[in-house]
């Protein structure tokens, strides 16, 4: 299960509306890359695939492909603004290590096998 904070859900809806993607779905995935090995990938996509799992949180449907699901189980996605601007913040109980940028992580392999 994924959890979006109210501020994350509000920002996703704002982005979707401002980009005129109201018929698109919000996708959260992980991809190889970054200094810790895996990067979070956020996107709006026009279609749901057969491989997608759907989660509902904060009035937002979140699509997760089956390969990313184990890495994102119980993830909390927040959105916050500070002096440097706004950005999504990830709290991932499946991460053994998180890069200082907080956008890249190394998975706890025992949890994700």
UniProtKB/Swiss-Prot annotation:
One of its GO terms (cellular component) is cytoplasm. One of its GO terms (molecular function) is 2 iron, 2 sulfur cluster binding. One of its GO terms (biological process) is iron-sulfur cluster assembly. InterPro entries: FeS_biogenesis (IPR000361), FeS_cluster_insertion (IPR016092), FeS_cluster_insertion_CS (IPR017870), HesB-like_dom_sf (IPR035903). PANTHER family: IRON-SULFUR CLUSTER ASSEMBLY 2 HOMOLOG, MITOCHONDRIAL. Belongs to the HesB/IscA family. This is Uncharacterized protein slr1565. The lineage of its organism: Bacteria, Bacillati, Cyanobacteriota, Cyanophyceae, Synechococcales.
């Amino acid at each position: 299960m994924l959890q979006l904070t109210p501020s994350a859900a509000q920002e996703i809806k704002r982005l979707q509306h401002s980009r005129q993607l109201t018929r698109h779905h919000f996708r959260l995935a992980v991809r190889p890359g970054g200094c810790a090995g895996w990067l979070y990938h956020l996107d709006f996509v026009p279609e749901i695939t057969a491989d997608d799992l759907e989660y509902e949180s904060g009035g937002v449907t979140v699509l997760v492909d089956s390969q990313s699901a184990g890495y994102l189980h119980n993830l909390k996605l927040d959105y916050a603004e500070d002096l440097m601007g706004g950005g999504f913040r990830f709290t991932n109980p499946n991460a053994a290590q998180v890069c200082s940028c907080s956008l890249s992580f190394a998975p706890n392999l025992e949890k994700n096998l």
